[in-house]
Curated annotation (Swiss-Prot):
Co-factor requirement: K(+)
Compartments (UniProt record): Cytoplasm
GO cellular component, one term: cytosol
Name of the gene this protein is made from: mnmE
Organism of provenance: Shewanella sp. (strain MR-7)
Subunit structure as annotated in this protein's UniProt entry: Homodimer. Heterotetramer of two MnmE and two MnmG subunits.
Positions of K(+) binding: N225, T244, I246, T249
Official protein name in the record: tRNA modification GTPase MnmE
């Protein structure tokens, strides 16, 4: 790790009441002596002049000194809190850079120092950026939970359990005369099953946390002229899609990004699905299926005037059977203004069914509440933890190795192969918190932070 002392503006660029300059590294004390003329008492606010090399006052404000390792970064840290004019702050940074051995910080470098000095792990460091970027109260609460170590705690528990089981299995291998007894007595299998179950719970929570952070991708799909584009317009609150009585008007994918109580929702309107010889329409239908296969949720749009059925398997079995097995489906019976249906939501064989009129807006608000619920919106509860795509991928990899290990144990009683799968699962989980993480990944993560964090 670099031993450079770094400086950056910690507050947002532009005009403001207060502006903060942060310095971290062993030269922070030199900066204090050069700019303030003295070293402030650690952890005490010191009102003083900020001076240039000639002794002229640049600004007046509060200086805060934190002696390492008792600081956010683990290094010596000096914060200069002055007036928020950008010119004044630029002059102050220029003055700090005149001290030998100081350079401008790279994006996220303060958080990277904290990570390298074991002041926080990788998920906590990422949570800082997520807290800053939060677009809803729920996202902010979840990011704060991660910053306080809730996600890390879950991952560390899994790593410890996997490590303990791996050591137990390797002990069985080291005593070959007793290996079969060790592997077949049920203790290892029971421990493995418990780990798999716990990982499944963490995966579900992480998936929810990822949706809160990144938004949920919802694809509106169905036959031509079912009202898909009208629903897109109703959810977006504007005329995003052309709506006509002509079936097949939408031939390409249309996207809208909206927020429901601050929670991001990515809505995809697709071409009507049907057999066609029209080349352009065929391309649109192929793209529709590509979007469906990568969706978090499908709104199955049904023209209520064409069928009374509510079970999607009765409405269009070929469509339902082609969907990915783990893809959630909400049935939306449209044109309730014409059918006179009761707008109450019902559950039909595990599917939520909503009756709406995309044209008049009837039932659309209830559908929005449903989507908010799917995204984990809770108006009065503490948030869960926040999660990123890389976390989900690492959890999936760990789950895959545990399943392979389960097969090796149940079918072959292969201790060596089980131990190897446990080792791979351990590595995947440890990458989440940064116990075993490549420098390339660290660089990618911290470079996405804002400067000054």
């Amino acid at each position: 790790m670099t031993t450079d002392t770094i400086v950056a503006q910690a507050t947002a660029p532009g005009r403001g009441g207060v502006g903060i300059i942060r310095i971290s590294g062993d030269k922070a004390t030199d900066v204090a002596m050069a700019v303030l003329g003295h070293l402030p008492k650690p952890r005490y606010a010191d009102y003083c002049d900020f001076k240039n090399a000639s002794g002229q006052v640049i600004d007046q404000g509060i200086a805060l000194y934190f002696k390492g390792p008792n600081s956010f970064t683990g290094e010596d840290v000096l914060e200069l809190q002055g007036h928020g004019g950008q010119i004044v702050l630029d002059m102050l940074i220029k003055r700090v850079l005149e001290v030998e051995g100081i350079r401008i910080a790279k994006p996220g470098e303060f958080s990277e120092q904290a990570f390298m000095n074991d002041k926080l792990d990788l998920t906590q460091a990422e949570a800082i950026a997520d807290l800053i970027d939060a677009t809803s109260e729920q996202a902010a609460k979840s990011a704060l939970q991660s910053l306080q170590g809730e996600f890390s705690k879950e991952v560390h528990e899994l790593v410890d359990q996997v490590t303990h089981l791996r050591l137990y299995v390797e002990a069985a291998i080291d005593f070959p005369d007793e290996e079969v007894d060790f592997l077949s007595d049920g203790k290892i299998a029971n421990a493995l099953y418990k780990i798999i179950d716990k990982l499944s719970v963490v995966q579900a929570s992480a998936k929810q946390g990822s949706i809160i952070r990144e938004g949920m991708k919802v694809v509106i799909a169905g036959r031509p002229n079912a009202g898909k584009s009208s629903l897109l317009n109703a959810l977006a609150g504007k005329e995003s899609a052309i709506v006509t009585e002509i079936a097949g008007t939408t031939r390409d994918v249309l996207r809208e990004h909206i927020h429901l109580d601050g929670m991001p929702l990515h809505i995809i309107d697709t071409a009507g699905l049907r057999d066609t010889t029209d080349t352009v329409e065929q391309i649109g239908i192929e793209r529709a299926w590509n979007e469906i296969n990568s969706a978090d949720r499908v709104l199955f749009m049904v023209d209520g005037t064409t069928t009374d059925a509510v079970d999607p398997h009765d409405i269009w079995p070929d469509f339902i059977n082609r969907l990915p097995a783990n893809l959630g489906v909400t049935v939306v019976r449209n044109k309730a203004d014409l059918t006179g249906e009761n707008l109450a939501m019902t559950e039909e064989k595990g599917y939520s069914v909503y009756r709406i009129s995309a044209k008049t807006g009837l039932g659309v608000e209830e559908l929005k509440q449903h989507l908010k619920s799917l995204m984990g919106y809770q108006s009065n509860l503490e948030g869960g933890f926040i999660a990123r795509r890389r976390h989900l991928e690492a959890l999936d990899i760990a789950a895959s190795h545990l399943q392979l290990g389960k097969e090796q144990l149940e079918i072959y009683l292969a201790g060596e192969l089980l131990a190897e799968e446990l080792r791979m699962a351990q590595l995947a989980l440890s990458e989440i918190t940064g116990r075993f993480t490549s420098d390339d990944l660290l660089g990618k993560i911290f470079s996405s932070f804002c400067i000054g964090k």
